């Protein structure tokens, strides 16, 4: 099924972003594991798996639309401390949210409602799960203090 070139190109833009999010969550999850923060490791490992699923959905859609997937992730910006890592992940999720909203509008413009629905599902996951959880963690650090927060993540 031939897709609109502009939609395919934008789906590729989103794909490279999802691959970057996957990679950033991957490194952060392994850093948390190495530092002994098992709760943070488990959550970020889960997020990495979800980003992989998002990338897979985009990849499959691009192929169905007869496009060529771009499998080179965007640059990642891993943190070196827990607060930096949470902030970096939240910044990434906010970027993804804006990109998904733009993609939804583009898909509607070109009447590609299946791609739009894929992006809408990913947007809901980004807003209601990923970004919300990261905002919660940063709020906990602000209220509890970093030392108490880190102790709660062992």
From Swiss-Prot:
GO terms for molecular function: ferric iron binding; ferroxidase activity; heme binding; iron ion binding; iron ion sequestering activity. It holds the Pfam family Ferritin. Fe(3+) C binds at residues 46, 50. Its EC number is 1.16.3.1. InterPro entries: Bacterioferritin (IPR002024), Ferritin-like (IPR012347), Ferritin-like_diiron (IPR009040), Ferritin-like_SF (IPR009078), Ferritin_DPS_dom (IPR008331). Fe(3+) E binds at residues 50, 129. Disulfide bonds: none annotated. Residues 1-145 form the Ferritin-like diiron domain. Keywords: Cytoplasm, Ion transport, Iron, Iron storage, Iron transport, Metal-binding, Oxidoreductase, Transport. Induction: Transcription is up-regulated by FeCl(3) and H(2)O(2). This is Bacterial ferritin. The gene is ftnA. Disruption phenotype: Produces about half the wild-type levels of catalase A in strain PAO1 (katA), slight increase in sensitivity to H(2)O(2), a double katA-ftnA deletion is more sensitive to H(2)O(2). When grown in iron-limiting conditions is less sensitive to H(2)O(2). BFR complexes are composed only of BfrB. Fe(3+) D binds at residues 47, 50, 129. Belongs to the bacterioferritin family. The keyword Repeat does not apply. The bacterioferritin (BFR) complex is formed of 24 subunits (FtnA and BfrB) arranged as 12 homodimers. The holocomplex contains about 8.7% Fe and 8.0% phosphate. In vivo purifies with BfrB in varying ratios, depending on the O(2) content; as O(2) decreases FtnA content rises. Pure FtnA BFR complexes are not isolated in situ, although in a bfrB deletion some iron will accumulate in FtnA ferritin complexes. Fe(3+) A binds at residues 18, 51, 54. Plays a role in catalase A (katA) expression; activity is required for optimal KatA activity and resistance to H(2)O(2). Iron-storage protein that is part of the heterooligomeric bacterioferritin (BFR) complex. The ferroxidase center binds Fe(2+), oxidizes it using dioxygen to Fe(3+), and participates in subsequent Fe(3+) oxide mineral core formation within the central cavity of the BFR protein shell. Can store up to 520 iron atoms per ferritin protein molecule. Iron release requires only the input of electrons from ferredoxin NADP reductase (FPR), does not require Bfd. Does not bind heme. One of its GO terms (biological process) is iron ion transport.
């Amino acid at each position: 099924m031939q897709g609109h070139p502009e939609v395919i190109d934008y789906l590729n833009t989103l794909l490279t972003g999802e691959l970057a999010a996957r990679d950033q969550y991957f490194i952060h999850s392994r850093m948390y594991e190495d530092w002994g923060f098992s709760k943070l490791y488990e959550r970020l490992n889960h997020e990495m798996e979800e980003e992989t699923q998002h990338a897979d959905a985009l990849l499959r859609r691009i192929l169905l639309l007869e496009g060529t997937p771009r499998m080179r992730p965007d640059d990642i910006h891993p943190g070196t401390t827990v607060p930096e890592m949470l902030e970096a992940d939240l910044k990434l999720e906010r970027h993804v949210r804006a990109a998904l909203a733009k993609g939804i509008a583009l898909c509607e413009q070109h009447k590609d409602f299946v791609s739009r629905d894929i992006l809408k599902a990913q947007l809901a996951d980004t807003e209601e799960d990923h970004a919300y959880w990261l905002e919660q963690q940063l709020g906990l650090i602000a209220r509890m203090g970093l030392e108490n927060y880190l102790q709660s993540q062992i």
